[in-house]
Amino acid sequence: MAKAAVTKRHHFMIQKLLILLSYGYTNGLDDAHSLRCNLTIKAPTPADPLWYEAKCLVDEILILHLSNINKTMTSGDPGETANATEVGECLTQPVNDLCQKLRDKVSNTKVDTHKTNGYPHLQVTMIYPQSQGQTPSATWEFNISDSYFFTFYTENMSWRSANDESGVIMNKWNDDGDLVQRLKYFIPECRQKIDEFLKQSKEKPRSTSRSPSITQLTSTSPLPPPSHSTSKKGFISVGLIFISLLFAFAFAM
């Protein structure tokens, strides 16, 4: 019993450190403007017919708020309304189609009933940094019921999971060619409009934000990609957290 408890605590600590590791990586990209879409898929109820909700933002500007019930598009600056509306309109159909696909996918995914209660709750985060003329690459982070975590990188069409249990589900999703294609071409469909809006945002200063707490990072931060250009700041963060991982493993022995 005691050994099992120590092992569980050890795994929990390693998971948190891995999440911080990914934040150290992405923190090095803070100077780049990016598009972020947050998708939520859940089971509808008679009292709440909402089964999906999507929000897409460029930095702090909400450009699309979409659900199976209604749609709104907003811009924080009247001067950006036209461009924000164009991006939002372009993303509307891909977002709607993808959420429908994800709903079907998660409903057919077998999960440990001890970890989930009823219909699995899916959270997806897509991050697309300004491409600057390069091949557009996006990161897709998947969180099923705060228990299964994996990430897809369109840059090299690779997947990474947080643990073996997540890997089982991840491999099945990877075998779904239609899903993979939707993830791959989500950005290219609207790339020109998105890049133009990101370029416009680049000319304006960004507001700084504090580093998120460990609880905020749990369900939204990706694992670091297998290969990617990273700034010096990102490398320093990764190095420090890697040392922490070594200490964690040493204490667990």
UniProtKB/Swiss-Prot annotation:
A lipid is attached at S227 (GPI-anchor amidated serine). GO terms for cellular component: external side of plasma membrane; plasma membrane. InterPro entries: MHC_class-I_related, MHC_I-like_Ag-recog_sf, MHC_I/II-like_Ag-recog, RAE-1. Keywords: Cell membrane, Disulfide bond, Glycoprotein, GPI-anchor, Lipoprotein, Membrane, Signal. It comes from the Eukaryota. Disulfide bonds join C37-C56, C90-C190. It is found in: Cell membrane. It is a lipid-anchor; GPI-anchor. Residues 1-28 form the signal peptide. Residues 228-253 form a propeptide. Induction: By retinoic acid. Glycans are attached at N38, N70, N83, N143, N156. Glycosylated. SUPFAM superfamilies: MHC antigen-recognition domain. Acts as a ligand for KLRK1. Belongs to the NKG2D ligand family. This is Retinoic acid early-inducible protein 1-gamma. The lineage of its organism: Eukaryota, Metazoa, Chordata, Craniata, Vertebrata.
